Amino acid sequence: TGTEAGLSTRTIAKIAKGEKLSTHSLNRIAGYLNVAPELLCRKEADNKILQILRDEKEIQLSGGLYHELQVRMTYNSNHMEGSKLSEDQTRLIFETNTINMGDGIPVDDILETVHHFRAIDYCIDIAEEKLTEEIIKKLLYMLKHDTKDTAFPWFAVGDYKKRANVVGGRETSKPSEVARDMRALLERYNARDNVTIEDIIEFHAEFEYIHPFQDGNGRVGRLIALKECLKNNIIPFIIEDSKKSFYYRGLSEWRREKGWLVDTCLDGQDTFVKLLDILEIPHE
């Protein structure tokens, strides 16, 4: 009981009401239960959306924000890159971990869908951490491991590209330049005190200009944007497959006209806001 643990009636009343306790009281309870104090409490995120995602992820709540973010972002991000899975099929995989193989879906599309679910989990788990090369490489590895790409030694799953590539006819950083360019990009970005959604969009565009990986750059870039929005208490954006022509135009024209990509990402933020409204989650 509370008195056996050496707690005052006032402290017991606080526990009953779910109010905050002092460190001294927590240590007393932990000592009585013979457990570490940190096992009795958890740190809550300042970002309400991030905390909701973590709470729902922990209990695998169906039909909430976490559930819908997983399905909608995974479907749209993968479909933009050529996945043949429909949104309904993506939802089925998330909800039941099964799919009708009679649909003729490539195995890699299924694998990369499951991997994308785990990559979103990772972004939610480490949202507050400083963005690093290691985090970015891990996101690529999470997406591409065990796919057919791992059969090619030059593909370098989980590492920077070994072969030069072009995107939409546009030159990207050469393999010998990628590490230098990524370090410079991260140094500039992490030096900012108050990150805005425009800063995150700029990072996203410059990341795509570097195109550091052999494949998976777009999905990794959009996952980074999710993580950084959650870190900086900014409503995330989901680029819908139906808007991909505007999105790709915005990326290709970024260094000449920034407004196209910014407008497309803000439209994606409106998509997320609509989801918050449907679920009656307050937002600013």
Predicted regions and their residues:
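Recognition helix of helix-turn-helix/homeodomain-like DNA-binding domains
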Residues: 6-21
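FIC/Doc superfamily catalytic core
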Residues: 42-284
